[in-house]
C-alpha cells in the first residue's frame, strides 16, 4: 500500500499518512491536494510543525537503471526505479564534432582553444550523479529524511588501484556525490558483498533481468540497504514501483545539424515551446495527461507520459491546460499479483 506524503503549512515534510486519512483531511478542509513530478501529496492548511520519525533512503546505483527506497521502521513508503542518464556522452561527442567542423570553414568563427581545458568531473559522469542528487532533493521536500545509505560501487583494477581511485570518472563522481549528500543528511555506505549477504539472510532473490520493471531488479537492494539502517521488517511490505525517466531536452541547440532544402536549417531545441516550458505536464481534451515537447508553426507536440511516445504535433496552446512543471516522466506500476494487497488499498 502506498502512503500519502504530508507537508506542513510552512513547507516542512511530516510523516506520511494513510490514504483514507488524507481524504478525510481534504474533506474537512484541513489539507489541500498537491502534485509534484508524478507524486501526489497533501499540504496541511493550519499545522506548521509536527513530530517525525527516522526515515531512511536506500540507493542502489546502476549503469542503466537504479533503485531508490524510502523507508521507516514501520512502513516502506516508496520504491523508485529510475533510468540512468546515458545520453550526455553522445551529446558531447556531437558537440565536439560540430565545433571542429566550424573551425575549417571559410569564415572560422570557432578558433581552436587548446589551452581551455576543463577541470572537474566529465560532463557525462556529473550528469549521472547529479540525477541521483536531484531525486534525493525531490524526496527531501516530501519526506522527513534523516539518513541516506548507498551501495558503495568501486572501479578498481588489480593493476593500478591508485590510478582508479584518483582519476577514474566513476570514483571521482562517486566521491563528489558523497560530499554533496553529507551536506544534506548523514550518509552510510555498504559494500556490494555486504548487500548480497543481507539479501540472502532475508531470503530475497534478485533477478538477472536488470532492465525489467520489477521490484527484484534493483529496488530489492535499495530496500535491503534501508532496512539494514532503520530495521522493522523481515520481508518487504511494499513492492510497488514508481518508474522515473529523465527527459532529454535539447536546451542549447538552436537548429538541426543537417541543412534542409535550400541549405536552410530548421529551428530545433530550446527550453520553451510557445509559452510552455518543455516537459511540463498538461491536460488535453483528447489525449488526457501528457507533457509538452517541441513546437513548430504555432503548434506544440504532446508526448505520452508512460513511454514518451509522441501523440501529436499540431496542438494549439489554447487547447491544453497547464498542470505542473516536470523534468522527468513518472509512471506508477500496478500492484503485483499475489503480493497480498487488498483491493481497497490501491484505490
Positions of PLM-derived features:
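Low-complexity, highly charged intrinsically disordered N-terminal segments
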Residues: 1-18
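Short acidic-glycine loop/turn motifs at beta-strand connectors
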Residues: 8-10, 71-75, 285-287, 296-297
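Charged, flexible boundary elements
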Residues: 17-51
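Gly/Thr-rich phosphate-binding beta-strand-loop-beta motif of the actin/hexokinase/Hsp70
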Residues: 53-72
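SH3/SH3-like beta-barrel fold
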Residues: 68-70, 300-306
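Substrate-contacting helices/loops that form the catalytic groove of nucleic-acid
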Residues: 72-278, 322-347
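A short macromolecule-binding patch
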Residues: 78, 303-321
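Short beta-strand-centered aromatic/proline hotspots
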Residues: 280-281, 287-303
Amino acid at each position: 500500500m502506498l502512503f500519502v506524503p504530508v507537508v506542513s503549512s510552512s513547507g516542512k515534510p511530516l510523516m506520511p499518512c494513510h490514504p483514507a486519512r488524507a481524504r478525510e483531511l481534504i474533506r474537512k478542509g484541513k489539507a489541500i491536494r498537491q502534485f509534484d513530478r508524478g507524486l501526489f501529496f497533501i499540504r496541511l492548511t493550519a499545522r506548521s510543525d509536527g513530530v517525525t520519525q527516522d526515515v531512511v533512503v536506500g540507493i542502489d546505483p546502476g549503469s542503466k537503471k537504479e533503485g531508490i527506497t524510502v523507508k521507516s521502521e514501520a512502513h516502506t513508503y516508496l520504491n523508485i526505479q529510475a533510468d540512468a542518464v546515458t545520453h550526455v556522452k553522445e551529446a558531447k561527442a556531437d558537440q565536439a564534432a560540430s565545433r571542429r567542423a566550424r573551425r575549417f570553414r571559410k569564415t572560422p568563427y570557432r578558433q581552436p582553444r587548446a589551452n581551455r581545458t576543463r577541470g572537474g568531473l566529465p560532463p557525462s559522469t556529473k550528469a549521472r550523479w547529479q540525477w541521483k542528487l536531484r531525486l534525493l532533493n525531490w524526496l527531501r521536500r516530501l519526506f522527513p529524511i534523516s539518513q541516506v545509505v548507498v551501495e558503495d560501487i568501486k572501479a578498481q583494477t588489480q593493476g593500478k588501484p591508485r590510478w582508479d581511485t584518483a582519476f577514474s570518472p566513476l570514483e571521482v563522481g562517486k566521491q563528489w556525490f558523497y560530499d554533496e549528500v553529507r551536506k544534506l543528511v548523514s550518509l552510510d555506505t555498504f559494500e556490494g558483498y555486504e548487500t548480497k549477504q543481507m539479501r540472502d539472510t532475508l531470503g530475497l532473490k534478485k533477478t538477472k533481468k536488470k532492465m525489467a520493471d520489477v521490484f527484484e531488479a534493483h529496488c530489492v537492494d535499495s530496500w535491503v540497504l534501508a532496512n539494514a539502517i532503520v530495521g522493522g521488517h523481515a520481508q518487504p511490505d511494499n513492492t510497488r514501483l514508481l518508474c522515473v525517466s529523465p527527459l532529454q531536452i535539447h536546451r542549447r541547440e538552436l537548429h538541426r545539424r543537417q541543412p534542409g532544402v535550400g541549405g536552410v536549417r530548421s529551428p530545433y531545441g530550446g527550453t520553451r515551446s510557445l509559452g510552455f516550458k518543455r516537459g511540463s505536464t498538461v491536460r488535453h481534451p483528447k489525449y488526457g495527461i501528457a507533457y509538452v515537447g517541441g513546437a513548430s508553426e504555432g503548434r506544440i507536440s504532446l508526448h505520452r507520459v508512460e513511454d514518451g511516445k509522441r501523440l501529436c504535433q499540431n496542438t494549439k496552446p489554447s487547447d491544453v491546460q497547464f498542470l505542473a512543471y516536470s523534468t522527468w516522466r513518472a509512471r506508477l506500476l500496478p500492484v503485483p499479483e499475489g503480493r497480498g494487497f487488498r483491493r481497497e488499498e490501491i484505490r
